[in-house]
Amino acid sequence: MITFGKLETQAGADKQKEISAEAEKVKCLIIGSGPAGYTAAIYAARANLSPVLYEGIQPGGQLTTTTEVENFPGYPDGVQGPQMMEDFKKQAMRFGTDVRFGIVTSVDFSKRPFKVIVDDEKTIEAQAVIIATGATAKYLGLESEDKFKGSGVSACATCDGFFYKGQDVAVVGGGDTACEEALYLSGICRKVYMIVRKDYLRASKAMQQRVFNTSNIEVLLGHVTKEIVGSNVVEGVILENSKGELVRKDIAGFFVAIGHTPNSEIFKPWIETDEQGYIITKPGSTHTNVPGVFACGDVQDKHYRQAITAAGSGCMAAIDAERFLSEHGLA
């Protein structure tokens, strides 16, 4: 008699055997798209590394949820985020990158070639791996928040603050990131409401002092965001104060600054990360603690998080990968 557990174990073994038999060997594998992944692909392809790129769950990354991008060189009239990522993708493919839709579900970086499982069914064996999986902004989870993403709701003041020049905006969050966003917006916008759920700021004392010393920032302690309102764009926000009273603030932009989650979970058994999950790279490079595995873009950058810096680190990762492969006689 065969028990279910034994049957399941045998099925798993058979599946693993089937996967292993179909392993595809590649020189350079890029995990993730967006500015970092596509730029890495452009440089890797031009270096004749025959890169294979898996786009992941959100092809094009965070920029595909952005309407207008006006701060990336080469687009003097601005460009829609999705169109910009399509341009990056076409350029990567033009030089020979094999761009594929698929999600990397597990990895084994214990030895080279590195084993990467895609969609729980296909194995890639790669001599070099570039991780460009990005980070996901944390949101409040309101329906109205989803409704206005790209139409007044943003998770990046540096990216979108300019659209609200001379207008009133709100920033939600009480840490250093929220303070930095509020201070940045204070130099562009007429008024900045800082919505803080607790009755105190979690930011450093120095950052708090800068916020409280800025005349056009109003800190609303003990306020919870209940709803973002407007017709086609954001027009206001409904807050609940510590007394349970509902208060409306008229705003044009709503900036969420409660943190990001780096998409690094599947790499943690092998790759060193900080306490927040950002991949740690060696200073001045994209090298991780595993030789032959490189990281670029927002998965390793918690300071800048810009398309241009992500693209730059993607270039670095491809150059680092090419040099690594050359040193090992594999380029």
Where do the language-model regions lie?
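A Rossmann-like FAD-binding core segment of flavoenzymes
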Residues: I2-A11, A92-V118, T123-A126, G187-P283, ...
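An active-site-proximal "capping" alpha-helix that borders the catalytic cofactor pocket
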Residues: T309-L325
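Phosphate-coordination loops involved in phosphoryl transfer and adenosine-cofactor binding
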Residues: K25-K27, F101, K165-Q167, G222, ...
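Glycine/small-residue-rich loop that forms an oxyanion/phosphate-binding "nest" at active or ligand-binding sites
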Residues: V99-F163
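Beta1-alpha1 glycine-rich phosphate/pyrophosphate-binding loop at the start
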Residues: S20, V26-F95, Q167, C179-K205, ...
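FAD-site-proximal beta/loop scaffold in flavoenzymes
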Residues: G5-K17, A21-A23, T136, G141, ...
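Residue-level detector of alpha-helix initiation sites
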Residues: G34-P35, Q58, A135-A137, D176-T177, ...
